[in-house]
């Protein structure tokens, strides 16, 4: 009965001690290797485990993984790894990862594998404890202080248990009281001893305005038979001891409380506490089995050692007076289910291209067919991180089509596998990264910009090419000789006839009164507007709408010549034309390309200002299409052209004498005589400011033509009229008038209603009668053949020079080209216009009258030098 009561009180005391130490009790901790241990298998032939030890314990002790099979324990060899595969290291430690491979093929659904860790050597300690010599009384409790006047009363209590059972009595204990300021250390604290359960503290013991702290502990009195140590209250003083194994636990102490408990504590190097766990084991007697003390309490320590505590029950101190206590390494482990911890081998990844798309293909390795699994694919740009990659979770497939990728970009992809359904595990390792580069494709924006640029460039090229081609064409066209470029025949020769150049003839010369005066007056105000309505080119002299029938071949008998000349007086006495009569359109040269040509009915075209003769043996007909390329000489004609420079170089011109028979109604007959050849006399009248050549009448019924030193570019062929010439013979040039009959060119009287005179035409070539040209070759005594007509120079009237002759009647006339202008053979662009002396007044009264009138007005007959042709026409342009 007494023993049962003692056991009951012992258990109550242990419960009370446990309540007092409750705030320090903690559960048994798992070590870092056990926390990080994870094992997975392929469920075929191996198990892979991953765990980590702390870096601090690495130099003190090595831990070994143990694999417990059904019939044996296998030590597993592990190697260092770069990282933990499936777990994380605790934040308070620095881990050293390890990886272990365990060959194993006996897998089944009921497997529950057990793993543990063992240090590389035995670790432990042992102590013999006599109870009477290891007594530590319990600490005081229920401590409180209260003011009492100017003193402070500190009170406490101690539970000594049943006096019948307990070895400890109030006579065996005393109390030690320590006090100090709050900021002071306990080593500097003041203390006092008392055997009472209270103490009165005087004010002189304290400093004013300070906070103090006090503590009490129980001590064994000096007269007690027990020995031991005081109760806990303050930390122990630490000092350095002799060198030793720091991984070994030390300072194992056990104290019997004198009642029913044995309190033990030990210290462990703090750096090893993360890797190794220790436990307290004891034997009540040497023959008793070893038991484990629990629970183990860890005291927080600021030093390099960590203190652990554990209390042992002492139910029968008398029966078991000596305990054997030891601290050993605790073996810890856990169970892992194999079919829930499967990790497969990583797949093998490849990539293929299908036209414009890309596909990923992979193959798995060593996967049982009955284990269902799934795949996870990640792909990204090579420059990006895997955190920004795109992830696709697929079923049990072995390929995946990638979406549209950016061109000319490097991509990376990887794949892994994981078991699902009845089996479980974790993802396998990622496969090797597969890298490829997509093909380069021109962006759509670039294509649009290039097309726009090409179109714009093409338009610019076409534009500038067109402009350049047009300019080149114009330059090329300007180099082609063309009569239309010449100002000689533009606007009817308006530029060659200044308004005041003919005023002297119209107002001062009595021989020009009447129709001729009106004719000259109209020259100053003549209008060329009618040229715009003409169907022929402005260079055409003859009106294409009204031409006359060409007369028959000229009769060389004197009668024919007389008949043609009988009409001249009629023309001279003709009155003015009524104003109601329509004015004849101003004719002009006809041209087409580089050729000049008059209507077919004329040997040379008429110039503006000359009237056609009355109809002689012909009627008006519609205009025949004139040759635009040729001017025909009269059939069978022997007319020749001689340059004036050559003619004038032979001597001075003879005076022109005209027979009085020219003024009668009868036609003057040309009597062939054995005299020197008759030459044509040419006269030139030049104005003061603008040189003007007086026209020479061709004697034809269709009018006459004016000429200058040059014509526009081309190869014109002048055509002589087929009708009889109405010219009279005059004196030969350069011969005395007494030795040869004179020829005087004479124009028919010009009606008042006829058009005004046009600009000067060809000037430096004259026509020689056949008799003149043949006289040089005729033998003496044989007269020259009679001439039908010959040009006669009549002063005061326009003169005409017959067109140049060709080697045959219809041959071409070759001109000399200088720049854009052509000149007659033998003349340059700066040739001076030749002229002759005025005719003798005794031979031609009209010429004499004109000379007198001109002499009064002081019009010199000496010619002024003409400007070069090119400069002349440039001056007309500007």
UniProtKB/Swiss-Prot annotation:
Motif extent (Box 1 motif): 476-484
Membrane-spanning parts: 441-462
Biased composition (Polar residues): 554-570
Pfam families linked to this entry: EpoR_lig-bind (PF09067), IL3Rb_N (PF21460), Interfer-bind (PF09294)
GO molecular function, one term: cytokine receptor activity
Membrane topology: Single-pass type I membrane protein
Extracellular topological domain: 23-440
Domain Fibronectin type-III: start-end pairs: 139-244, 343-438
Stored SMART domains: FN3
Subunit architecture: Heterodimer of an alpha and a beta subunit.
Family according to the record: Belongs to the type I cytokine receptor family. Type 4 subfamily.
Descriptive protein name: Interleukin-3 receptor class 2 subunit beta
Organism of this sequence: Mus musculus (Mouse)
